[in-house]
Amino acid sequence: MRYRSMTVTLQPADLLARLQSRHPLLWLNPHAGSPLPHDAPGPGAIATAEARLARCEPLMAELFPELATSAGKIESPLMPADNLQRTLSLPADTHGAWFIKRDDALPIAGSIKARGGFHEVLALAESIAIEHGLLEPAGDRRILASAAARERFAAHTVIVGSTGNLGLSIGVMASALGFESVVHMSTDAKPWKKARLRQRGVRVIEHDGDYAQAVAAGRAQARNQPRSHFVDDEGSLMLFLGYAASARHLAAQLAEAGRRVDATHPLFVHIPCGVGGAPGGIAHGLKALFGEHVHCFFAEPVASPCMLVQLAAGLGKPVSVYDVGLDNRTEADGLAVAQASHLVSPLMASLLSGVFTVSDAQLYAQLLAVQHATGVELEPSAAAAVGGPGWLTRSPAGRDYVHRHAIDLRQSTHVIWATGGSLVPPEEHRRFQSHAKALAGAAAGT
């Protein structure tokens, strides 16, 4: 366990003790709706990311045969989840309609990290190719898969620090274009993720420390290595905008499903949060489209609520979960982050409705509930947000939020973001299910 000698004041006053108890809780953001920072990315920046991903679709279809049927689009289904709602005993007459956003099924990388990771590597490839005269600004992006481009990219190294899924997305995309790729992985990273990267020719450097140490090691390598690009999960605008670009497609999916989003038909989006880049980007993109009619809540482990801690402490100085006596140890490897993104937390101070925490036992119970109700197999991190809708009616804080915003939950739409799982080996899924059933049996016997 790592601690720093530091006095931390959190709001409300009883929050520190509640966090240290490691009992799940819902924290509401008292600053939600405050003005965004003056340097916050605007709609134009999101539109630029959308345009980049669109013009690279033919390239993606050429690089990855599995994208042929989608013409190179990196998108996931929006799956109705009424059965899950019933499994969790949350009736539709008090909770509206439920959907699962299936980023666990995103092609190639199998997780939400494909959105930001692919976008950043594509932006880098465009920049290098244009700089060296291989690509015109309006040119066909399939030139980035040419022998000349690959030769140029081979002289460059893409470096990232990760607990797993971002490393997978960066490593796969970079190696597909011919870049040298190095992924620094924390002690939380699963062995199968390391093996999958190595099979792609990616160099994996393993660290005994946590996520922050892996990121720091990657940053140090990039600082000392010529022609290298560091993908900074803690502060990359390119990653952030790649995630934000997902909002427009979700809006189209909701419209296709007949779900309105307006003053009388609120949208609730529940997203697992690690360092904050992916959920923060999605929240930013959705707020740009729907404004006050969308309510975004993050899900964090009871041992690693880094965004909650940073926002509750204020933005004056960085505060980590170690500073409040937590150990950052969780089965949710993708969420095992001690310090929230310095890029994202100031934005979330304005945009985020709240954060709810989840125990490892709940992760597995929710993973099992999703599998029973829908047949979808998730990794533990991806199941973190499943309990989000229930907090709104089963907790005093949630009921207060609904009352203060004059929300009729019967008219609401809930999107639970499933962030990863389709690439998990079958034996790992069997282990998840077995552990979940054992926990359920133990709970029933107490």
Swiss-Prot record:
Gene3D superfamilies on file: 3.40.50.1100
- Where N6-(pyridoxal phosphate)lysine occurs along the chain? 113
Q: Does the keyword DNA-binding apply?
A: no
Q: Care to name a GO molecular-function term for this sequence? A: D-serine ammonia-lyase activity
Record InterPro entries:
D_Ser_am_lyase, Ser/Thr_Dehydratase, TrpB-like_PALP, TrpB-like_PALP_sf
Q: Which family would the database say this protein is a member of?
A: Belongs to the serine/threonine dehydratase family. DsdA subfamily.
Q: Which HAMAP family match?
A: D_Ser_dehydrat
Q: What is this protein called?
A: Probable D-serine dehydratase
UniProt gene name: dsdA
